[in-house]
From Swiss-Prot:
<feature type="disulfide bond">
    <location>
        <begin position="513"/>
        <end position="517"/>
    </location>
</feature>
<dbReference type="InterPro" id="IPR051418">
    <property type="entry name" value="Spondin/Thrombospondin_T1"/>
</dbReference>
<feature type="domain" description="TSP type-1 6">
    <location>
        <begin position="754"/>
        <end position="806"/>
    </location>
</feature>
<feature type="disulfide bond">
    <location>
        <begin position="615"/>
        <end position="650"/>
    </location>
</feature>
<feature type="compositionally biased region" description="Basic and acidic residues">
    <location>
        <begin position="732"/>
        <end position="746"/>
    </location>
</feature>
<dbReference type="GO" id="GO:0046872">
    <property type="term" value="F:metal ion binding"/>
</dbReference>
<feature type="binding site">
    <location>
        <position position="358"/>
    </location>
    <ligand>
        <name>Ca(2+)</name>
    </ligand>
</feature>
<dbReference type="InterPro" id="IPR000884">
    <property type="entry name" value="TSP1_rpt"/>
</dbReference>
<feature type="disulfide bond">
    <location>
        <begin position="202"/>
        <end position="415"/>
    </location>
</feature>
<dbReference type="GO" id="GO:0050693">
    <property type="term" value="F:LBD domain binding"/>
</dbReference>
<dbReference type="InterPro" id="IPR036383">
    <property type="entry name" value="TSP1_rpt_sf"/>
</dbReference>
<comment type="function">
    <text>Cell adhesion protein that promotes the attachment of spinal cord and sensory neuron cells and the outgrowth of neurites in vitro. May contribute to the growth and guidance of axons in both the spinal cord and the PNS.</text>
</comment>
<feature type="binding site">
    <location>
        <position position="354"/>
    </location>
    <ligand>
        <name>Ca(2+)</name>
    </ligand>
</feature>
<dbReference type="Pfam" id="PF00090">
    <property type="entry name" value="TSP_1"/>
</dbReference>
<keyword id="KW-0272">Extracellular matrix</keyword>
<protein>
    <recommendedName>
        <fullName>Spondin-1</fullName>
    </recommendedName>
</protein>
<feature type="domain" description="Spondin">
    <location>
        <begin position="195"/>
        <end position="388"/>
    </location>
</feature>
Length: 807
């Protein structure tokens, strides 16, 4: 007895992926299955078109995300590969991504979006447009698509695949056909240590780094610095694992410090070049003034660099200006894959990080060096209430920039010879080799012809070609290389959603015919409304010409005129304006009448929409003098609007400012206050008194020298009397002095009338080494006699000059 095979329906539990293979055979579904399909309301009700039971084959098939990450960065692009290990194969598949613990029966259950790489291999499912399936059922061993990670706050996501090998054999959803990715905490971006494996790739690869700044008043309005906002020049390199330019948790080098605080890449480049054995390419790109404007999207700063097996990492940084020491960049980004190949594309959203050298908390905080220096760390929304990124709820910081790293060529023998997609065959066509002209000197060529039209007539990738002729081969034993050159290109007619194409305005009406009678030419124009988002050049024509015939027949009254001259510049720099052109009468009419032919024409002209291109500005002036005469200051430069009335409001900065450093400021000598005047050095007659001051700060850096530290002035005591009574008094004092001297010799201390004194102390050190200083010594009372009537029993102090020789 033959049983009808029961149709199989994909589980609507945590399974996130289903695989469908359209087969020619008609399938019979049970009523129960159809009821379940109807209950799903038509949203991704996926019926697996296979007649059989699920097989165990998870060692044969695998679902991998390039780099094998456990976390995803919101908005980043990841290459997803579904493959079969030879000799296994598969004919059909389905790939889908859902939020964790979601069933997939609602639109909001799905996470991220897929991008098709090869339309001949893959397509979106007609009944479930968020899922990817095969374009045609045939034997294959691998397919690839890009998955764009969902926005912040999505949580964990599960990618799942189902595979149909034959009509009665299928594998679904579990084991190696499932990949779980969780959202990466932006505050830990790049902080977690990740092992850098030895690279096994062969040959070299060439990449282009493109930097898209997104830091603007619209995206980051709090305290946004309207003046002098900019990104400094990009500096970095491709290097080995033995060299670190910068890393989270490490300390900034002097080069990193100068980039972070001054925006100067000079020291950083010097440090990189000193590591010549560990560095393959120094990466440099221009600065952006201001930090965001449309031209930064159309022609974003970019730089090309190469990597090899030893030097397969790349790092770079650029300063947000003005800021204390804030930067963005990548550290040790590995471009080598575990499959011994080279990563095709890296897209990273960037948040700012602190270099740990300045403690400012706002864009324009005054200089405040961090002592001791702190480690490099990412900024967070809870750092400081005055921070422009502060959020009391602790949310993630909005990305300030995006960097795109694309592989543009591979050179030399490659280990992984399977192309990542069909476009690799075009993308890897010899652009690397064109950097060095290896044409033998014995081969003489003509110049290259112009590039041909793109081979694709629709908005798809194609090739264009140019040729040259071999004029002479001077040595027949030396072969001459190619006479044809190919380059990838995009065909015309792309839609507005295509980031690599232009958006054009409608054609302006045809101009008048160039002649007043007979056959002439006319033209019309259009303008670029939106340049390509990827910064490529717009190749679509902006002008068309065609022949025109004026019905009026040329008669004897007709005149001969020259060709029209070139059109004058449009009277407006943006929006609608007028332009003129002129011609001259070469020969007047034969009948002597006036020439009726036009000799001047005027027509409307359309420039790009106002504020979509940079303003028409004069060149920058020279930098002004530093705002200070010594130490740290600021300097500025200006530019002017060339056509203010026509342009209207212009948001471009007309002034720039940067830090400047001059020699240290002089420090003058600092002195203490004057001391009190000393006692007069004479008890009668003329004498002098002294006062002093001390040096508290010696002069530095050419400061004012120290003035005098000792001053003298005359003093007069009572007149010295010579009367007998005075003479007797002196004799009495002399007698008492002799008696005191005797007592002093008898005792261990000195004795004055009425008291006994201790010996004089030693003289103090001189207050100056030269130019006149003073010394002091003291005598103190040791014992007072009760019967003494003398009042001179008190502590004594003596002062004398010292080091009076000139300095």
């Amino acid at each position: 007895m033959r049983l009808s095979p029961a149709p199989l329906r994909l589980s609507r539990g945590p399974a996130l992926l289903a695989l469908a293979l359209p087969l020619a055979a008609a399938l019979a579904f049970s009523d129960e299955t159809l009821d379940k399909v109807a209950k799903s309301e038509g949203y991704c009700s996926r019926i697996l078109r296979a007649q059989g039971t699920r097989r165990e084959g998870y060692t044969e098939f695998s679902l991998r995300v390039e780099g094998d990450p456990d976390f995803y960065k919101p908005g980043s692009s990841y290459r997803v590969t579904l493959s079969a290990a030879p000799p296994s194969y598969f004919r059909g598949f389905t790939l889908i991504a859902l939020k964790e613990n979601r069933e997939g029966d609602k639109e909001e259950d799905h996470a991220g979006t897929f991008q098709i790489i090869d339309e001949e291999e893959t397509q979106f499912m007609s009944n479930c447009p968020v899922a990817v399936t095969e374009s045609t059922p045939r034997r294959r061993t691998r397919i690839q698509v890009f998955w764009i990670a969902p926005p912040t706050g999505t949580g964990c996501v599960i990618l799942k695949a189902s595979i149909v090998q034959k009509r009665i054999i299928y594998f679904q959803d579990e084991g190696s056909l499932t990949k779980k990715l969780c959202e990466q905490d932006p505050t830990l971006d790049g902080v977690t240590d990740r092992p850098i494996l030895d690279c096994c790739a062969c040959g070299t690869a060439k990449y282009r780094l493109t930097f898209y700044g997104n830091w603007s008043e619209k995206t980051h309005p709090k305290d946004y610095p309207r003046r002098a906002n900019h990104w400094s020049a990009i500096i970095g390199g491709s290097h080995s694992k033995n060299y670190v330019l910068w890393e989270y948790g490490g300390y900034a080098s002097e080069g990193v410090k100068q980039v972070a605080e001054l925006g100067s890449p000079v020291k950083m480049e010097e440090e990189i070049r000193q590591q010549s054995d560990e560095v393959l390419t120094v990466i440099k790109a221009k600065a952006q003034w201001p930090s965001w404007q449309p031209v930064n999207v159309r022609a974003a700063p970019s730089a090309e660099f190469s990597v090899d097996r030893t030097r397969h990492l790349m790092s770079f940084l650029t300063m947000m200006g003005p800021s204390p020491d804030w930067n963005v960049g990548l550290s040790a980004e590995d471009l080598c894959t575990k499959e011994c190949g080279w990563v095709q594309k890296v897209v990273q959203d960037l948040i700012p990080w602190d270099a740990g050298t300045d403690s400012g908390v706002t864009y324009e905080s005054p200089n405040k060096p961090t002592i001791p220096q702190e480690k490099i760390r990412p900024l967070t929304s809870l750092d400081h209430p005055q921070s422009p990124f502060y959020d009391p709820e602790g949310g993630s910081i909005t990305q300030v920039a995006r960097v795109v790293i694309e592989r543009i060529a591979r050179k030399g023998e490659q280990c992984n010879i399977v192309p990542d997609n069909v476009d690799d065959i075009v993308a890897d066509l010899a652009p690397e080799e064109k950097d060095e002209d290896d044409t033998p000197e014995t081969c003489i060529y003509s110049n290259w012809s112009p590039w041909s039209a793109c081979s694709s007539s629709t908005c798809e990738k194609g090739k264009r070609m140019r040729q040259r002729m071999l004029k002479a081969q001077l040595d027949l034993s030396v072969p001459c290389p190619d006479t044809q050159d190919f380059q990838p290109c995009m065909g015309p007619g792309c839609s507005d959603e295509d980031g690599s194409t232009c958006t054009m305005s409608e054609w302006i009406t045809w101009s008048p015919c160039s002649v007043s009678c007979g056959m002439g030419m006319r033209s019309r124009e259009r303008y670029v409304k939106q340049f390509p988002e990827d910064g490529s050049v717009c190749m679509l024509p902006t002008e068309e010409t065609e022949k025109c015939t004026v019905n009026e027949e040329c008669s004897p009254s007709s005149c001969l005129v020259t060709e029209w001259g070139e059109w004058d510049d449009c009277s407006a720099t943006c929006g609608m304006g007028m332009k003129k052109r002129h011609r001259m009468v070469k020969m007047s009419p034969a009948d002597g009448s006036m020439c009726k032919a036009e000799t001047s024409q005027a027509e409307k002209c359309m420039m790009p929409e106002c504020h979509t291109i940079p303003c028409l500005l004069s060149p920058w002036s020279e930098w002004s003098d530093c705002s200070v005469t010594c130490g740290k200051g600021m300097r500025t430069r200006q530019r002017m609007l060339k056509s203010l009335a026509e342009l209207g409001d212009c948001n471009e900065d007309l002034e720039q400012a940067e830090k400047c450093m001059l020699p240290e400021c002089p420090i003058d000598c600092e002195l203490s206050e004057w001391s009190q005047w000393s006692e007069c050095n004479k008890s009668c007659g003329k004498g002098h008194m002294i006062r002093t001051r001390t040096i508290q700060m010696e002069p530095q850096f050419g400061g004012a020298p120290c003035p005098e530290t000792v001053q003298r002035k005359k003093c007069r005591a009572r007149k010295c009397l010579r009367s007998p009574s005075i003479q007797k008094l002196r004799w009495r004092e002399a007698r008492e002095s002799r008696r005191s001297e005797q007592l002093r010799e008898e005792s261990d201390g000195e004795q004055f009338p009425g008291c006994r004194m201790r010996p004089w102390t030693a003289w103090s050190e001189c207050t100056k080494l030269c130019g006149g200083g003073i010394q002091e010594r003291y005598m103190t009372v040791k014992k007072r006699f009760k019967s003494s009537q003398f009042t001179s029993c008190k502590d004594k102090k003596e002062i004398r000059a010292c080091n009076v020789h000139p300095c």
